[in-house]
């Protein structure tokens, strides 16, 4: 693994409201707190971490496109786009960067429309229902994959 390894963390719509929005489902941690924890974890491993949260699908797609040749791994919480976005799926397939899908809540224990993901069958792995800690597990897995190269 080179010291230049980079991981991109993408968060979809309404994740900017963490700590306020439905804490019973999503917890009390804010997005900046989660990103700070991940940044420290990545720095300890000698990995550069980038983060983007957007409520706009096209901004997430553009970030995925820009990652091609610049990022070694993606961790994505597509949020509501999980269940609707063929475009995000196509972008991830187009750049062929390995990715892990993360969800704070257990989407399979919620409304039926949340049970389908357009990304899960293409992800290296899916972590759901573990709250903010799910991001840490995803980052640990990504780092392990990069270190194994």
From Swiss-Prot:
GO MF assignments: 3-dehydroquinate dehydratase activity
Q: Which UniProt keywords apply?
A: Amino-acid biosynthesis, Aromatic amino acid biosynthesis, Lyase
Q: Any keyword Chaperone?
A: no
User: Pathway it belongs to?
Assistant: Metabolic intermediate biosynthesis; chorismate biosynthesis; chorismate from D-erythrose 4-phosphate and phosphoenolpyruvate: step 3/7
EC category:
lyase
Q: Specify the domain of life of the species encoding this protein.
A: Bacteria
| Quaternary structure and partners | Homododecamer.
NCBIfam families xref list? aroQ, PRK05395.1-1, PRK05395.1-2, PRK05395.1-3, PRK05395.1-4
Protein name (database record): 3-dehydroquinate dehydratase
Upper lineage is: Bacteria, Pseudomonadati, Pseudomonadota, Gammaproteobacteria, Vibrionales
Gene expressing this chain:
aroQ
């Amino acid at each position: 693994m080179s010291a230049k390894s980079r991981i991109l963390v993408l968060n979809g719509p309404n994740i900017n409201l963490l700590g306020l929005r439905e804490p019973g489902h999503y917890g009390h941690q804010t997005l900046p707190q989660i990103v700070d924890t991940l940044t420290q974890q990545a720095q300890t491993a000698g990995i550069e971490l980038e983060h983007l949260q957007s409520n706009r699908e096209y901004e997430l797609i553009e970030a995925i496109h820009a990652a091609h040749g610049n990022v070694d791994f993606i961790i994505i919480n597509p949020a509501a786009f999980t269940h609707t976005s063929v475009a995000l799926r196509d972008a991830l397939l187009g750049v062929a960067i390995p990715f892990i899908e993360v969800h704070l809540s257990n989407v399979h224990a919620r409304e039926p429309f949340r049970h389908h993901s357009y990304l899960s069958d293409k992800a290296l792995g899916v972590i759901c229902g573990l709250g903010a800690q799910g991001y840490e597990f995803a980052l640990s897995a990504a780092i392990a994959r990069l270190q194994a190269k």
